[in-house]
UniProtKB/Swiss-Prot annotation:
Optimum pH is 8.0. GO terms for molecular function: magnesium ion binding; phosphoenolpyruvate carboxylase activity. Homotetramer. Its cofactor is Mg(2+). The keyword NADP does not apply. HAMAP family: PEPcase_type2 (MF_01904). Mg(2+) cannot be replaced by Mn(2+). NCBIfam families: PEPCase_arch (TIGR02751). It comes from Sulfolobus acidocaldarius (strain ATCC 33909 / DSM 639 / JCM 8929 / NBRC 15157 / NCIMB 11770). Optimum temperature is 90 degrees Celsius. Is extremely thermostable. No loss of activity is observed after incubation for 2 hours at 80 degrees Celsius. The times required for 50% loss of activity are about 60 minutes at 90 degrees Celsius, 10 minutes at 95 degrees Celsius, and 1 minute at 100 degrees Celsius. This is Phosphoenolpyruvate carboxylase. Catalyzes the irreversible beta-carboxylation of phosphoenolpyruvate (PEP) to form oxaloacetate (OAA), a four-carbon dicarboxylic acid source for the tricarboxylic acid cycle. InterPro entries: PEP_COase_arc-type, Pyrv/PenolPyrv_kinase-like_dom.
């Protein structure tokens, strides 16, 4: 059995600070090669995600890593000890990126040839897995592996002229097969994960399967509680599928540093491991790496790598049904408020620091994220916007718990172990003065502000969460939030950007 990595470095642009080796405010181009190397060598991460989704990507990454850092990669074998995993665009959803999907898969045999030259005959393929975002059906997964086999590998035997075949021109194509990792990003797909993962296993019978569960996008689209509980539901179903099909399943979880996006920070590693039992691989995003002291980051990653994976969560069918109902109920109260704040969120998002040279992801070229009836920025900008206006997104929707039954509340507290811990972190940054400024600057309806205050009241009075803290950093963040909003009100956007960046540094993440 191959090694399954415990940590995966990603290129998510959630870092408030820029690492010292990067020139400029955004990480791009050659610096992403340096970043991948440092993830392995400095931080001890076991896998790097190479992201071709929604951004320009260097398809020569393996060539550059092996040629620029030969000593390191001779001792740590790519594809055996450490791993590089492509995240490809989903051609079904991202129409403008279809050819990028094909281009990325076509580089896999090139990486094999490079490894053969570097390591010798029959090397471990340096790239043999791809992550498929927005997976909603088993057919999408099968299409990826069949595209690789039929279009790329089988083209070896295509006759060109007389006795000349494709393989005579470009050489034999290896590896012969690739593995696909479904990335499940929406609540409904998590709640019917059997029809995606189960059906795929039934048809393809893989020796094992890695399944990637998102935390950020479900939180943005359905609210914090719905996201956490959907993941717990999916983990329970995966545990049962392992037994049904006799195939080992290794779940990955896409987590950021702030509670809304997973609360996987160097300070909270222990809690995250306990919260998400059965997860094999956690994403180490940019804020984790660059907004904390290096020694803290390195020791946290070492801890995760060295911790044994606990048994997967397995719920009774009754509990699964209750959780499914809770996620739908919670979403309704959450989405109504987000729809009312969408215009503000989108405007404030434009003022946040840019940390990656991403291509446009709103409009024609790429995608934005839709919640209910509105379009929102990507999850990091969404979270950053709400923290900026003094309404941490973790709080939004909480008052809907007052309408839950005792059975439903028990399901929430039993299955979201660190709910209060996560809410307490976020509640430090609530800014009451900002609620009034929302009405003054953007004419937000008084009923919406009242509904958000109800969420805050529920957190304080029913859950015992302290709103606001007296420590220096919490008070500084609240003050900066007020200054940022006053700057926007006066049209002083450059000043607002300065305050917004300072706030991100205080909370150690953009969003």
């Amino acid at each position: 059995m191959r090694k399954i990595p415990r940590t995966m470095s990603t290129q998510h642009p959630d870092n408030a600070k820029v690492p010292e080796w990067n020139q400029g405010e955004a990480i791009s181009g050659e610096n992403e090669i340096i970043e991948a190397y440092l993830a392995f060598s400095r931080y001890g991460v076991e896998e790097v995600m190479w992201d071709a989704e929604g951004k320009d990507v260097d398809t020569h990454v393996v060539r550059k890593l092996l040629s620029q850092y030969p000593e390191f990669f001779r001792h740590r074998i790519l594809g055996k000890d450490i791993f590089l995993t492509y995240r490809v665009p989903n051609p079904k959803i991202e129409g403008a990126e279809r050819k990028v999907f094909a281009e990325t898969l076509n580089t896999i045999p090139i990486t094999y040839d490079l490894a053969e030259k570097f390591y010798g005959e029959n090397p471990n393929p340096p790239v043999f897995e791809v992550i498929l975002p927005f997976t909603t059906s088993y057919e999408e997964l099968i299409a990826v592996i069949k595209f690789y086999e039929k279009v790329i590998v089988n083209s070896d035997n295509t006759k060109l002229v007389d006795d000349t075949y494709v393989k005579d021109i470009i050489g034999e194509t290896n590896p012969k097969k690739i593995e696909v990792i479904p990335l499940i990003e929406d609540r409904d797909s998590m709640l019917r994960i059997d029809t995606i993962v189960g059906k795929y296993i039934e048809i393809e019978r893989p020796p094992y399967l890695r399944v990637f569960l998102a935390r950020s996008d479900p939180a943005m689209n359905y609210g914090l509680l719905s996201a956490v509980l959907s993941v717990k539901y999916a983990l329970s179903r995966l545990s049962k599928m392992e037994k049904i099909y006799g195939v080992k399943i290794f779940p990955l979880l896409g987590v950021g540093s702030l509670p809304f996006r997973g609360h996987f920070s160097p300070y909270n590693v222990e809690n995250t491991l306990n919260e998400y039992r059965g997860i094999y691989t956690f994403t180490v995003q940019s804020a984790f790496k660059y907004d904390y002291e290096d020694d803290l980051v390195i020791s946290a990653i070492k801890k995760v790598n060295g911790t044994n994976v606990t048994e997967k969560i397995e719920l009774s069918e009754e509990d699964e049904e209750i959780i499914s109902n809770v996620t739908r109920k919670y979403t309704q109260g959450y989405q109504n408020k987000i729809e009312a704040l969408a215009d503000v969120i989108n405007k404030v998002a434009l003022l946040l620091p840019r940390r990656r040279a991403r291509k446009l992801h709103i409009g024609l070229f790429g995608y934005s994220r839709s919640t209910g009836k509105v379009t929102l920025p990507r999850a990091i900008s969404f979270v950053g916007s709400l923290y900026t206006i003094g309404i941490p997104p973790e709080i939004i929707g909480l008052s809907s718990l007052s309408k839950m039954t005792d059975q439903e509340l028990n399901a929430i507290f039993n299955n979201y172990k660190y709910l209060k811990n996560d809410l307490q972190f976020a509640a430090r940054f609530v800014n009451f003065e900002a609620l009034q400024l929302l009405k003054d600057i953007w004419n937000i309806d008084a009923e919406v502000v009242k509904a958000i205050k109800e969420d805050i009241d529920y957190a304080e009075n029913s859950l015992g969460i302290r709103i606001g803290e007296s420590d220096y950093m919490s008070k500084k963040h609240v003050l900066l939030s007020t200054l940022a909003l006053l700057s926007i009100k006066e049209g002083k956007l450059d000043e607002a950007k300065t305050y917004i960046k300072e706030m991100a540094i205080v909370r150690r993440a953009i969003g």
